[in-house]
Amino acid sequence: MLVYTDLLTGDELLSDSFPYKEIENGILWEVEGKWTTKGCVEVNIGANPSAEEGGEDEGVDDSVEKVVDIVDTFRLQEQPTYDKKGFIAYIKKYIKLLTPKLTPEQQEEFKKGIEGATKFLLPKLKDFQFFVGEGMHDDSTIVFAYYKEGATNPTFLYFAHGLKEVKC
């Protein structure tokens, strides 16, 4: 199995269990998330609850929670939204932090494509949810989530150059 970690922080952000499609000249990866239910596991331990003290099943939480698979699997943490000015400031900082960690070939690809990717992302800012890895570092790679027109499941966008492939 391959896990993709944040190149800047080491937080796990994605795995090969979630297929991706390259967009914006390979600068962004597009991944489809799915809503799933979590919780409400019925366990039959063979005991006769009516014969034991306590009556009701005490201490059993059978609540059901709807979660998005990618957010839940990688414990992504939602962040406040960005306005255009804040997003541009983040992108400038991100480029400055990420570029030295890339090979010269990757740096060239990233520099060529980041402007187009930024122009692709800017009009969608109001529609995005922003996530970072579990560590919630200030310098984290942002993962963007939004709903395509008519979709019931979210689509996630990752900066491809900000991910490091790790074999597990």
Curated annotation (Swiss-Prot):
Protein's cellular compartments: Cytoplasm
TCTP domain mapped to chain residues: 1-168
Sorted UniProt keywords: Calcium, Cytoplasm
Highest taxon listed in the record's lineage: Eukaryota
Keyword Calcium: yes
Keyword Magnesium among UniProt keywords: no
MF-aspect GO terms: calcium ion binding
This protein's GO CC annotations: cytoplasm
Annotated function: Involved in calcium binding and microtubule stabilization.
Family to which the UniProt record says this protein belongs: Belongs to the TCTP family.
Protein name: Translationally-controlled tumor protein homolog
Organism: Brassica oleracea (Wild cabbage)
Gene (UniProt): TCTP
